[in-house]
Amino acid sequence: RHGTTFSFNGKTYCVINAGKPVCASGEPKTDIYVLAKSEDGEKIEVKISYKMQNADFIENKTNEERAEQLLGPDWKTHIIDATKSIKEKFDDRHLIYKKRFAHTAAGSITLGWKFELVNKQGGELSGKMDLTAEQVYAVYSGNNLPDNKKNSSVNGEIIANSGVADYILISDDVASADDVVSKMQPLDKYIEEHPDIYFACKALNYRTYQAKYDGNRPLAVQV
């Protein structure tokens, strides 16, 4: 918050603006925006993507627009190649559940599978994405998102590129601003250490006994 001091790269800075960037629809990649000023007048921006340690999703609402922004003009090819790589696993899935199975309710009918980007392989319908380093950086930073998400609002003020993250913080507990600085990593450094992004396909089921489903969701694989 305003007035908080912290040490960064050998200097002491005082926060002059801080908040969560927001946009009219959807979300930018930055979760924490900080503008700070040093004693000698130098201003810096710190834009952090923040995740809990058990959070595995990177993008969990992947629609056509978002996929193109994150994966580029060949987004369809990336998704098709990814899902085809586990075709046999889709073929082995039940489509109609007369009885409850694991987390799937009795009477469910699978309509298809949603596509999510995650930071670790998880579940049976999951695999590694074939992406360049630039594409991986775009997924984490949001540097290819539209202007209304890149130039987000912080405390009511539109700030250029406030929605594009430069750092990542993965922690369940931070005690102070200095604690945040000590635990955050530059995105390019983090990606050097964690170069892989994975996909996970989650079923969209129609629950016949309740006559309900999870709403209209884009499907990477449909029945």
Label each region the model flagged.
Residues 1-223:
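Short, positively charged
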